[in-house]
Amino acid sequence: MSGLVDAQFPDLARRTVTRYGSGWDHELFCVGGKWIFRFPRRAERVPWLAREIQITAIAAETLGTAVPVFERVGEPCEAFPYLFVGYRLVPGVGADLACARDLAGLAADIGAVLAALHRVDPSRVPPTPDGWEREPWSELRTELAAVADLVRPLLGPDLLAQAEPYLAGRAAEPPQDGPRRFIHNDICPDHLIVDAGTGRLNGLIDFTDAMVGDPALDFAGLIGLGGYRFIDRVVAGYDLPLADGFGAKLEWLSRVLTLTWLAEAAAYDPAGVGKLLSWVIRAFSH
């Protein structure tokens, strides 16, 4: 990838290029220790990335440097067939990797960031390419039931008994009522970048899945950081009203999503099973 970056961004020529990581949708490379370049893994992801260029610019108007703006946009070429982007590295580590974690301070930071994000005018948010905004939560329930056999062998007897109504698709989804806001829609420890020493929030990354939706979706992913007690601390620092029934939504989403993520790990990322299993345990510790 170094030749590709050199050709399109001459000011970065001859900088050291190292692999930074990979996800479901992108390969990431660090250039010169200061820039992260994201390359789509499949053609279907290009419209999402093009949309994310707009999304991050909108979010950065409110959150400033906490959101990495795609300052560099690479064009498709013979060396790489898709649009790609570059942004300044947000210093720090994933929120679950900090050596010293000030959980109270981090919760306050996250609450403030989510409130600011959720205040953005939702009419400014471009629609998702696949129409996710219109999907009912019943689809989450049926998707989990379809992969439940990957999860059942991973759960102890007591946890399995608690999870079975969700795995069997019998735990009905709560109403999708209340205000619809601009949400990140993929809040998790990997996307909350914190100072490695203090554990305080430095930035929020990866707006690929951002959309207009229920704010409860942005709280459910926090289960991986400290369970419901931690989420309560985040809510205390969140100064927007939450709809009646927020607690029921949070519990249902936390359980359905963590079980689904555990199934994905079992299928595609066995090394991540232990971490995701701990999230499931937290989701059912309520």
What residues fall within each predicted segment?
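Juxta-kinase regulatory segment immediately upstream of eukaryotic protein kinase catalytic domains
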Residues: 1-10
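Short helix-capping segments at alpha-helix termini
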Residues: 9-10, 62-65, 153-158, 239-244
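ATP-binding pocket architecture of kinase catalytic cores
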Residues: 14-139, 149-154
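Active-site acidic catalytic loop and adjacent metal/ATP-binding pocket
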Residues: 24-31, 37, 70, 167-219
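Membrane-helix interface segments
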Residues: 63-65, 102-103, 178, 229, ...
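Helix-rich C-terminal or lid/interface subdomains of diverse kinases
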Residues: 95, 108, 209-286
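ATP-dependent phospho-/nucleotidyl transfer catalytic cores
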Residues: 98, 134, 148-181
